[in-house]
Amino acid sequence: LGAIPFVVPVRKGVTPSITTSCWGDSCILVPYAIYRSTGNREVLHQMYPVMKKYLADVSRWAMAGFIKNHSRYIFSLPFQFGDWCAPYGNPKDWLGKGPWTGTAYYCYACQVMSEIAEALGERADCDFYRKKSEKIKKAYRIRFMDGDGTLNEEFQTGYVLPLYFKMAGQKEAEKMADNLWKLIRENGGHLNTGFTATPYILFALADNGHLKEAYQLLMEDTNPSWLYQVKKGATTMWEQWDVIEENGQVKEASMNHYAYGA
């Protein structure tokens, strides 16, 4: 029906064929990145039917059980990776952030889909996805924020994604960026983000009045940080921030992964 499994090809009995944000959004974001790099619309033409089916499936899950109000735009089912492989907590904690990450990526996917539709001359679709993204933005703020740029439950990823995805007005975004930097300071000057937000955290800061602070975060070299991995001899990105721990012990995790901005 449009689900994009998070492992392809699907292995029966091993990999569930279910829709999940970020991983599934690759069917939209990767072709769009190719188009932006090459100017060639062919990949958009080829993938457009898949993109539409995917977003229709996301919409079905978001609306499951909800007919009215903002809840029908909150994407949390059937499964979300949430703040996957963040430095804090455990998998249960990461998965628990699924409603935030799922909804933010749902909004972003609709934004990008509107731009793709425009590039392909699909004006009705362009308008449809643009309007849907606006409704999702509103739903995110109603569900997760206090109306003044502060999350009801504060964590770095919850600010990074709506900042990078332009889900707030300028004044609100400035407050969100201030709050993000406050959380980073309170965490000893370290990021505290997983797969879904780390690629965007520097941009979320730099584009919203915190350029100097973004460079401070980039140059941090104690765990968790990018340069901590370099100090430990990494030449590729790890699956977790501290696959090699301070004491030299090595965890059972990938040391060549599609993670943290790689």
Residue ranges, per PLM feature:
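Active-site core of glycosidic bond-cleaving carbohydrate-active enzymes
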Residues: 1-262
